[in-house]
Swiss-Prot record:
Protein's name in the database: Arginine--tRNA ligase
Motif ('HIGH' region): 122-132
Keyword Aminoacyl-tRNA synthetase attached: yes
Keyword annotations: Aminoacyl-tRNA synthetase, ATP-binding, Cytoplasm, Ligase, Nucleotide-binding, Protein biosynthesis
Recorded name of the encoding gene: argS
Length: 576
């Protein structure tokens, strides 16, 4: 049950009954202090301002129409017109029971949507680097979360598998007479790409040969297509090893690269011209958008075809959106691309709406993110100033986690120890990113992310292992816990309410693409359980009924932590 949504609806109805405008909002949120109740509604303030009456007067009218007797033990007006709601302990216990016995922690079923999530998107012939980390793990966390809720999620790995670089690479491989393309690895390709780029910039004959190969590739030349496919396969084979290490759910079947839309591009341009959306201008084809103006106030032109007949990223992205709506039947499309692409995407979406490719009912959302920075506040680099490869970053995470964990677990066998190290290392890297608001830059700090204190993956993983250890000592499993939850202590009450707020939290994350809120929730839950554990004896409770009640709260805490971390793509461990 989404308590926040339930209470908001009731308060909004009472506001309207009290004479407030029909568009009034309860502005309900969990209270930050116990003296203000469990939830506080602030919507009276803005509604009263519109009506030009004292907020407290409107609040009193609202309470006359607000019946929460089935859920709250007390509803009071505080300050100038805030409404504080104190939940009833018996109602809390009943809802905890529903969560305990219900599938998916008793979540309300959603109306399923077809949701396309565009994330990761590495380039061919280059190793993945730290710049790919945020898109990959934030996008995957959202894919997991939305799938868990019951939506049909289509993962789209929009790899850069087309363009001039392939002509350059094919020309260079021919130049050095490289006959062993199947034996190449990605590091070879990176070296070849750098050399090919150098020749392309310095040797006009080579550059023309590369351009000729691009034309041949686009026209379906068998040799060029075979070489192109090998280059893509070599790259993505290596990238999928990184996905496996990161516990990312992308598969080869999710690959929807730029090349997928090639055959659509000529028709897209013709159609946009025919509809009057695009115009020919000095040999090029452009779309002029009134919404975007240049420095002198003229509509900005988005080029979709160059004078030489070539297409641009905008053309491909227009075709991509069209494909996702018409072929994939998307209801919602989420893009996990960095903030620098915001205007580009906005222009593409405006064009697709003008052309009628995207119905108004389809939501197009850019869930942009900031950069990963070093401790110096500059983009994260190697000590020599180079780009940090993703594989090197993960290797270092494992090494650092191993140094922390090996000494603390001397009796673990090597297999279990390595599994623990991997879970902590990869979890720490992912959580450090996911726990930050994606719209901001963040500082990458090894010491902080691997700490067993504070808002980190190791802290939450440890909290989970602590509960599983408790159950082993109890000799019970959850199926044998028959007693209902009895709330007598404030620490029990506080933990129970937070457990009930899981649904409103995961709903917010799914709506806004904000996994950092789930991280904050899990950290709060782990912390609140620790306080509960210290103040409320569990195994040594004063009677069996209280013992089972508290074990039930502990079991729900463990299940919620495990489920929350799983939706973030982070493993739990039974022992730390």
């Amino acid at each position: 049950m989404n308590i926040q949504l339930f209470l908001s609806d009731r308060i909004r109805h009472a506001l309207i009954m009290a004479g407030a405008p029909d568009d009034s909002d309860a502005q309900l949120h969990p209270s930050t202090k116990a003296q203000f109740g469990d939830y506080q509604a602030n919507g009276v303030m803005s509604a009263a301002k519109k009506q030009r009456i004292p907020p407290r007067e409107l609040a009193e009218r609202v309470l006359e129409h607000l019946d929460l007797s089935d859920i709250a033990k007390k509803v009071e007006i505080a300050g100038p017109g805030f409404i504080n709601i104190f939940l009833n302990e018996q109602w809390i216990s009943q809802k905890i029971e529903s969560v305990f016995i219900g599938p998916k922690l008793g979540l309300t079923p959603v109306t399923p949507q077809r949701i396309v999530i565009d994330y990761s998107a590495p380039n061919v012939a280059k190793e993945m680097h730290v710049g790919h980390l945020r898109s990959t793990i934030i996008g995957d966390a959202m894919a997991r979360t939305l799938s868990f809720l019951g939506h049909h999620v289509i993962r789209a790995n929009h790899i850069g598998d087309w363009g001039t670089q392939f002509g350059m690479l094919i020309a260079y491989l021919e130049k050095i007479q490289h006959d062993h393309a199947l034996e190449m690895v990605l590091s070879d390709l990176e070296h070849f790409y750098r050399e090919a780029k150098k020749h392309y910039d310095e040797d006009e004959i080579f550059a023309q040969r590369a351009r000729d190969y691009v034309v041949k590739l686009q026209s379906g030349d068998p040799y060029c297509r075979e070489m192109w496919r090998k280059l893509v396969d070599i790259t993505m084979t290596q990238n999928h090893l990184s996905y496996e290490r990161l516990k990312v759910t992308l598969t080869p079947e999710d690959m929807m690269g730029e090349s997928l839309y090639n055959d659509m591009l000529p028709n897209i341009v013709e159609d946009l011209i025919a509809k009057g959306v695009a115009v020919k201008d000095q040999g090029s084809v452009l779309v002029f958008l009134e919404e975007y103006q240049n420095k002198i106030g003229e509509p900005m032109g988005v080029v979709i075809q160059k004078k030489d007949g070539g297409y641009l990223y905008a053309t491909t992205d227009i075709a991509c959106v069209k494909y996702r709506c018409e072929t994939l039947k998307a209801d919602r499309i989420l893009y996990y691309i960095d903030s620098r692409q915001n205007q580009h995407l906005a222009q593409v979406w405006t064009i697709t709406r003008l052309a009628g490719y995207v119905p108004e009912s389809v939501s197009l959302e850019h869930h942009m993110f900031g950069m990963m920075l070093g401790k110096d506040g500059k983009p994260f680099k190697t000590r020599t100033g180079g780009t940090v490869k993703l594989s090197d970053l993960l290797d270092e995470a494992v090494e650092r986690a191993g140094q922390l964990i090996r000494g603390k677990n001397p009796d673990l066998n090597e297999t279990d120890l390595n599994n623990l190290i991997q879970a902590v290392a990869i979890g720490a890297v992912k959580y450090a990113d996911l726990s930050k608001n994606r719209t901001t830059d963040y500082i990458f700090d090894w010491d902080r992310m691997l700490s067993f204190e504070g808002n980190t993956a190791p802290y939450i993983q440890y909290a989970y292992s602590r509960v599983t250890s408790l159950f082993k000592k109890s000799g019970l499993d959850e199926k044998k816990i028959m007693s209902p939850v009895i709330i007598q202590e404030e620490k029990e009450r506080s933990l129970a309410i937070l457990l009930l707020q899981f649904e409103e939290m995961i709903s917010t994350v799914a709506r806004d693409g904000t996994p950092h809120l789930m991280c904050s929730y899990l950290y709060d839950l782990a912390t609140r359980f620790s306080i509960f554990y210290e103040h409320c004896p569990i195994l040594n409770a004063k009677n069996e009924q209280i013992r089972q009640s508290r074990l039930k709260l502990a079991w729900l805490t463990a299940k919620t932590l495990k489920l929350g971390l799983k939706n973030l793509g982070i493993e739990t461990v039974e022992r730390m």
